[in-house]
């Protein structure tokens, strides 16, 4: 019975997978199973077979009386190829259920695809799984191997060069017997660099006879990558750096005491670029730039600093932090005093004030929202607005009369009567303005309704009464002479 079950299982497994789907390891395993000779009463346990790629789940419910009637096996055989085992993927199992007659039930397929069991749930591969891990490096920062110098597209080039130079110097000094030749030192430096730094060391002709070869390489890197002329004029570059550091310290300002650490770091970095003899003056300048507690900290520094602590910016920063902590403690006490109950003051000594004005604090009552609304049985009358989306009507009112050319609707400027022009006015002879109009017509001028149309010209007409005055004077003289003659 067991032998027939094994034969059917192997045949069904061969039928489901096919020759094209088997790998070499699977093929060898199936051949070994078919070649084994088994007794009739021997029970087969496929899980005991020496194979890492074969997993079997077997369920047997048999009895001695009716072993042929009730026998049911659940065989799940899943095999993984060598390529899949190398990639680390988990094995997938195929379940084959055997009926009482010894046959097997073929897994159902949907639309030419594989068994529906495989489509319902797919196990995630290790590539799809998420394992939260802490980053080993700072995000956005390029990491190089131990002791290697790579300054390609780096911002902090000077720091990287200084650290690398210190490491190279330590290797050479601790192994003097191995690095007596400059060629060996250059070979070490070439293998400890990459990128443009390596190309500089490899393509430059170095002076191997005189001078320190490490110092030559470092000065060349300063010149080529930092723009500092350390190779030709190192002293001038140092002086220039000191002047820039002094200007930087003078311009530094601290407005918010919360940025004390950043301010101290920047000031200290520039201070150590100057001479140590100038440190006390720069420390006093540092303390004077700190708001709120700077004056008190400066007084303490002048009294407490002695010996080498005069040159220590760290000692000054320590005093500043102590004064800052005192202010923080005082602010905490003030917050606690606001919650202090004044009724507790009666516990101490008796009051010494009698009849004074009692100070009372205004009480603020909490406003509660009404639980009900006032019922209004009527609707508020809304204002009717007609023609909300139409053009508004023109307002009625007095309009200034328009006097077009060719019509006599204007008012005469001589008699102020509407219906005629000034040149047709009946009172033009008696009016003094009419004489002016008459003289204008004699000169060939005509009245214009729109004076600002066309070319604009201004004319001035002056009326002189000298002739009339002279005629009156002559008449007076004649009358006076006639009277004199009559008297004679």
Curated annotation (Swiss-Prot):
Q: Which residues belong to zinc fingers classed as CCHC-type?
A: 410-427
Say yes or no: keyword Metal-binding present: yes
Q: What does this protein do?
A: Self assembles to form an icosahedral capsid, about 50 nm in diameter, nm, composed of 420 subunits of the viral capsid protein. The capsid encapsulates the genomic dsDNA. Following virus entry into host cell, provides nuclear import of the viral genome. Virus particles do not enter the nucleus, but dock at the nuclear membrane through the interaction with host importins.
Name of the protein in question? Capsid protein
| Organism (species) | Cauliflower mosaic virus (strain CM-1841)
* KW Transport (keyword) present: no
Region annotation Disordered: where it falls in the sequence? 80-143, 463-488
Entry GO MF terms: nucleic acid binding; structural molecule activity; zinc ion binding
Q: Which UniProt keywords apply?
A: Capsid protein, Host nucleus, Metal-binding, T=7 icosahedral capsid protein, Viral penetration into host nucleus, Virion, Virus entry into host cell, Zinc, Zinc-finger
Motif annotated as Nuclear localization signal, chain positions: 121-124
Biological process (GO) annotations held by this record are:
symbiont entry into host cell; viral penetration into host nucleus
Localization recorded for this chain is: Virion; Host nucleus
Biased composition regions of type Polar residues, renumbered to the chain: 134-143
Compositional bias per record (Acidic residues), positions renumbered to this chain: 80-93, 464-488
- Assembly information from the UniProt record: Interacts (via nuclear localization signal) with host importin alpha.
Pfam families, A to Z = Caulimovir_coat_dom
Organism domain of life: Viruses
SMART domains noted in UniProt: ZnF_C2HC
| GO cellular component annotations of the record | host cell; host cell nucleus; T=7 icosahedral viral capsid
Basic and acidic residues compositional bias, start-end: 94-109
Task: State the family named in the UniProt similarity comment for this chain.
Answer: Belongs to the caulimoviridae capsid protein family.
């Amino acid at each position: 019975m067991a032998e027939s079950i094994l034969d059917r299982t192997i045949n069904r497994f061969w039928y489901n997978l096919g020759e094209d789907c088997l790998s070499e390891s699977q093929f060898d395993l199936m051949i070994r199973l078919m070649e084994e000779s088994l007794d009739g009463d021997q029970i087969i346990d496929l899980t005991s077979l020496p194979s890492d790629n074969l997993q079997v789940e077997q369920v047997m419910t048999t009895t001695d009386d009716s072993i042929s009637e009730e026998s049911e096996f659940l065989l799940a055989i899943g095999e993984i190829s060598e390529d899949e085992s190398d990639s680390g993927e988990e094995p997938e199992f195929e379940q084959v259920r055997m009926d009482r007659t010894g046959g097997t039930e073929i897994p159902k397929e949907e639309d030419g695809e594989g068994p529906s069991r495989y489509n319902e749930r797919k196990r995630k591969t290790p590539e799809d799984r998420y394992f939260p891990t802490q980053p080993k490096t700072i995000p956005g920062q390029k990491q190089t191997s131990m002791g290697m110098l790579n300054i390609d597209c780096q911002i902090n080039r000077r720091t990287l060069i200084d650290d690398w130079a210190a490491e190279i110097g330590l290797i050479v000094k601790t192994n003097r017997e191995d690095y007596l030749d400059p060629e060996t030192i250059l070979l070490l430096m070439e293998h400890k660099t990459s990128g443009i730094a390596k190309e500089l060391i490899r393509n430059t002709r170095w002076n191997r006879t005189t001078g320190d070869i490490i110092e030559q390489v470092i000065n060349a890197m300063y010149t080529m990558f930092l723009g500092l002329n350390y190779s030709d004029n190192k002293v001038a570059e140092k002086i220039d750096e000191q002047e820039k550091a002094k200007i930087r310290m003078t311009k530094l300002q601290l407005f918010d005491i919360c940025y004390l650490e950043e301010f101290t770091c920047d000031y200290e970095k520039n201070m150590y670029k100057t001479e140590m003899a100038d440190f006390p003056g720069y420390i006093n300048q540092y303390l004077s730039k700190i708001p709120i507690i700077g004056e008190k900290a400066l007084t303490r520094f002048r009294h407490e600093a002695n010996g080498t602590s005069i040159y220590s910016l760290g000692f000054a920063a320590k005093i500043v932090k102590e004064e800052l902590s005192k202010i923080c403690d005082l602010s905490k006490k003030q917050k606690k005093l606001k919650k202090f109950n004044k009724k507790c003051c009666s516990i101490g000594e008796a009051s010494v004030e009698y009849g004074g004005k009692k100070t009372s604090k205004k009480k603020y009552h909490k406003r509660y929202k009404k639980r009900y609304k006032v019922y209004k049985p009527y609707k508020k009358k809304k204002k009717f607005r007609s023609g909300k989306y139409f053009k508004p009507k023109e307002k009625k009112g007095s309009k200034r009369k328009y006097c077009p050319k060719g019509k006599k609707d204007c008012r005469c400027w001589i008699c102020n009567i509407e219906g005629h022009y000034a040149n047709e006015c009946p009172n033009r002879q008696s009016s003094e303005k009419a004489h002016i109009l008459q003289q204008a017509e004699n000169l060939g001028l005509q009245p214009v309704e729109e004076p600002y149309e066309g070319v604009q010209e201004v004319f001035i007409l002056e009326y002189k009464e000298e002739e009339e005055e002279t005629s009156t004077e002559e008449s007076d003289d004649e009358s006076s002479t006639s009277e004199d003659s009559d008297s004679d």
